Amino acid sequence: MEERMLMFPYILNLLAAMLLGALIGAERQWRQRMAGLRTNALVATGAAVFILSSMTTSPDSPGRIAAQIVSGIGFLGAGVIMREGMNVRGLNTAATLWCSAGIGVLCGLGQFKNALAATIIILCANILLREAAQRINQLPISAEGEKRYILKVTCNKEDESAVRQWLLNIVKEAAICLQGLGSVPAQEQGYKEIRAELVGHADYRKTRELIISRIGDNDNITAIHWSIDSQ
């Protein structure tokens, strides 16, 4: 009977971690992200297990294990971050996993009220701030600081894939933002026109010269056109 009484707080802490982690994961699952309900629940529960085990063996230094959890969860978070061209996906999901580990630490320490409050705040960040971020992304770019440019290059259709990768490397080297990349058949038969939408500083001359000079080194490109987007 005494052993069961000793086990009750342990189980309660783990259940609280699992439930709060699952609550955070439910939002990720609803948005069909890679790390969803089960992953966040397991991360929170695992963090609570480490804290509880450290309190059993070294009750005076649970903070040391918490620090190890913070660094260790980074490897798991890195697994959900993916790069697609110039875009990076999975940062929010990785950050959510990190937060779930924090919830597990609080539950392992028995700080249920703090864990619940943190869970609510994390959910608000993922749900309410999502719309705010989308609205901010739709705001027009300052005309004084940045401008939009259109870069068009013409190449043989067999070389399109290589030229696209060449353009991506040049844009990265020039430290300019790529907003869009597409291609259409050129006026000459057998050729493609690749169109890149760029965003950069209003003083574009140095950037333009760098990009055009680098593109000019590619023998597969037959024509280059640079213009300011008037939209």
UniProtKB/Swiss-Prot annotation:
Subcellular localization: Cell inner membrane
Record's note on what induces expression: Part of the mgtC/mgtB operon. Induced by low extracellular levels of Mg(2+). Transcriptionally regulated by extracellular magnesium via the two-component regulatory system PhoQ/PhoP.
Topological relation to the membrane, as annotated: Multi-pass membrane protein
Transmembrane region(s): 5-25, 39-59, 62-82, 103-123
Pfam families: MgtC, MgtC_SapB_C
Disrupted-gene phenotype: Not required for Mg(2+) influx by MgtB.
Keywords, alphabetical: Cell inner membrane, Cell membrane, Membrane, Transmembrane, Transmembrane helix, Virulence
Transcription is among the record's keywords: no
This protein's GO CC annotations: plasma membrane
Top-level division of the source organism's lineage: Bacteria
Main location: membrane
Keyword Cell membrane attributed: yes
Cross-referenced InterPro entries: MgtC-like_C, MgtC/SapB/SrpB/YhiD_fam, MgtC_SapB_SrpB_YhiD_N
Biological role: Virulence factor required for growth in low Mg(2+) medium and for intramacrophage survival. May be involved in regulating membrane potential by activating Na(+)/K(+)-ATPase.
Family: Belongs to the MgtC/SapB family.
Annotated protein name in UniProt: Protein MgtC
Taxonomic path: Bacteria, Pseudomonadati, Pseudomonadota, Gammaproteobacteria, Enterobacterales
Gene behind this protein: mgtC
